[in-house]
């Protein structure tokens, strides 16, 4: 999966006549600060993330992306917080020890689940449900919308631990070269429509989430809270500045989020 996702961003960087819809963390290959922006367990709500994407801090990241040939049209097509979906109740990192949890092929997901205590097991989504049924993996992670939309609940994984370890979101990108060739009046229309779409997506998720949880519960799914502090402590090694990141970028993100709370 990972090469396919990265290929979309690479096409944009190469100047292809192409719009890419990908996890914004992949922009981190070109602007490392984006990896910090999508580190695990940063956000408590959709609104926190949306406000941060509208800040001067992220405006600077967007400008750096444009220097790399990436025009960002949207950053918050959110599809929900990702939680653990397993057969047994998970409350602490210790409960995950030895458990094989399916992840996407992204390194950030693999590193996150590994730090949380699981044996991260990358699998294509098409193989995931059969792998759960056959016991190849002990569970998976994803949002309630994924759970209901793909009928994960019909399998043996009936427990959802509300880890909220990653905020699932997509961004929309186009080559700066291609963008510059679009007349300004149409640029304004395109940008406005993507911005409206972002807002609509967030409001839709907020309005539907409670109903989705109730529907999952009607199918026998049980939800439980976790020791958030224990998981955050386990994930601290991932809050380390990597090569190319702006010095202090994690602290700047933490400070901005603290100011919202």
Residue spans for each PLM region:
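N-terminal secretory/targeting leader peptides
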Residues: 1-48, 56-57, 63-261
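Short beta-strand-centered segments that line the small-molecule binding cleft or hinge
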Residues: 51
């Amino acid at each position: 999966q990972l090469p396919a996702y990265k290929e979309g961003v690479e096409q944009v960087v190469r100047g292809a006549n192409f719009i890419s819809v990908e996890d914004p963390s992949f922009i981190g290959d070109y602007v490392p600060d984006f990896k910090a922006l999508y580190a695990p367990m940063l956000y408590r709500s959709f609104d926190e993330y949306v406000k941060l994407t509208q800040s001067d801090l992220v405006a600077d990241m967007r400008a750096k992306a444009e220097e790399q040939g990436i025009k960002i049209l949207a950053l918050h097509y959110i599809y929900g917080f990702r939680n653990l979906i397993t057969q047994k109740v998970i409350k602490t990192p210790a409960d995950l020890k030895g458990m094989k949890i399916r992840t996407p092929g992204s390194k950030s997901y693999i590193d996150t689940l590994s730090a949380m205590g699981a044996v991260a097991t990358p699998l294509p989504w098409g193989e995931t449900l059969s792998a759960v049924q056959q016991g190849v993996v002990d569970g998976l992670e994803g949002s309630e919308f994924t759970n209901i939309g793909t009928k994960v609940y019909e399998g043996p994984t009936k427990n959802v631990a509300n880890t909220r370890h990653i905020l699932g979101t997509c961004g929309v990108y186009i080559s700066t070269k291609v963008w510059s060739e679009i007349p300004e009046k149409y640029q304004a229309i395109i940008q406005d429509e993507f911005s409206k779409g972002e807002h609509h997506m967030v409001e839709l998720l907020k309005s539907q989430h409670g109903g989705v949880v109730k529907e999952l519960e009607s199918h026998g799914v049980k939800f439980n809270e976790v020791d958030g502090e224990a998981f955050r402590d386990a994930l601290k090694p991932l809050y380390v500045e990597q090569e190319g990141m702006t010095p202090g970028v994690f602290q700047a993100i933490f400070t901005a989020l603290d100011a919202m709370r």
